[in-house]
């Protein structure tokens, strides 16, 4: 096993432990709590994959961080913080929308790289909007926290979430997963659009209405409809 992989996991475990103290003292806001919960699931998945105990890893991670801080000068720390780019956390969904349980009558699940796509194939002829909570850096999506598909009535009918066992994903990974989810929902004649936030940062293949361009299947269907009317 790569020692760098192990030490990275150990440090992440300790840093999560430190961050956990913030909400314990009633200091964390909603985005902070979102990331904390997601990171906890990710650490559990990584620990299972690596075969490492999280409690033991946290102790070792503390030793690594303490050693680094002991060697780090205040001036070097200031320079590092000044040069580090700042990311922004954007939210389409409320805490309730993110944490709400949902059920599928005809479940379908697909893994696309480090992302898991779930949708209910029983949903037909609905207007659906995709919403997501994610961080942005350099005007591009950095980390997807969670994406969900909602009907006009507010029911959840689809979801894209990071796989805890495969941390890390790119903007292209997210864009590809969105394409898969949209394609699956549109197969049952649903009309899908993305939120303005997603359209700006993660799904640039949309038209001015926030909808993706028509697929070949949709174009053929539209052509048949037009011919029948003529």
UniProtKB/Swiss-Prot annotation:
Organism classification: Viruses, Riboviria, Orthornavirae, Negarnaviricota, Polyploviricotina
Originating species: Influenza A virus (strain A/Leningrad/134/1957 H2N2)
Domain description: The dsRNA-binding region is required for suppression of RNA silencing.
Recorded GO CC terms: host cell cytoplasm; host cell nucleus
Superkingdom of origin organism: Viruses
Motif (Nuclear export signal): 137-146
Full protein name: Non-structural protein 1
Matching Gene3D superfamilies: Influenza virus non-structural protein, effector domain (3.30.420.330), S15/NS1, RNA-binding (1.10.287.10)
Record-stated family: Belongs to the influenza A viruses NS1 family.
Residue segments, region PABPN1-binding: 223-230
Post-translational modification: Upon interferon induction, ISGylated via host HERC5; this results in the impairment of NS1 interaction with RNA targets due to its inability to form homodimers and to interact with host EIF2AK2/PKR.
